[in-house]
Amino acid sequence: MLIVVSPAKTLDYESPVSTSNFTQPELTAHSAELIQVCRTLSSQDVSELMSVSDKIAGLNVARFAQWSETFTLDNARQAIFAFKGDVYTGLEAETLSPQDLDFAQQHLRMLSGLYGVLRPLDLMQPYRLEMGTKLANARGANLYQFWGDIITEKLNQAIEAQGDNVLVNLASNEYFKAVNPKRLNAQIVTPIFKDAKNGQYKIISFFAKKARGMMARYIIENRIKSVKDLEGFNTAGYYFVASESTPTELVFKREEQ
């Protein structure tokens, strides 16, 4: 079972991490190409392209300038600890055991606009480049055209290496659009998380993102191997709803918080 999640805009390069083990990201030649494009952008260009404040634009212009093709624990940190958005609040990577991290290294992948695909212990230099960014490049008008089938091929390698053909899609639509399902050698299963609000169950972004991280942790901690076993997920009050689920979409609901 291979899990894919989105990255996060919020990063943490300060908090202590639980391991000094790391691996090198595998698609850095492609990342370096994107960095060269990004280095041609002014702070105002970045602000307009990414719809961010002048301050955040300036920060990322500096990050692009400082980015190096050599990744060390001095200029980078393991991706699973560097990302700190809602998904990662749910994942709580800092409390995973060494054995959990070993399992995650084989079974969890983070999609990324700059790095393509990251394993949990892959070193990552700080950046901001969301997959939906319309960054013109030598391969096309945006990052989907830049990455083409590279991300899909990398996921296929991971699927083959870990021994079955189930991919659990816990990524956002923006990121999973970078994957070509027709070329993916896997059955795709997408968990859907709905929270009660004013008497109706709906997908509430903040809760759904956190739930995706909690589901990833559930799979890692329990060494889940089958789609059937995903139905047992009950973290934070969620429960499986068989009547609304299909073989490709598993629906989980929770009462109003």
From Swiss-Prot:
What are the coiled-coil residue ranges? none
Signal sequence bounds: none
Instruction: Identify one Gene Ontology CC term for this UniProt entry.
Output: cytosol
One Gene Ontology term of the biological-process aspect is: response to hydroperoxide
Name a Pfam family for this protein.
H2O2_YaaD
The record, for InterPro entries, names: YaaA
Superkingdom, natural source: Bacteria
The cross-references to PANTHER family, in alphabetical order and at most eight, read: PEROXIDE STRESS RESISTANCE PROTEIN YAAA, PEROXIDE STRESS RESPONSE PROTEIN YAAA
Q: Which family does it belong to?
A: Belongs to the UPF0246 family.
- Put simply, this protein is called UPF0246 protein VC_2355
The scientific name of the source species is Vibrio cholerae serotype O1 (strain ATCC 39315 / El Tor Inaba N16961)
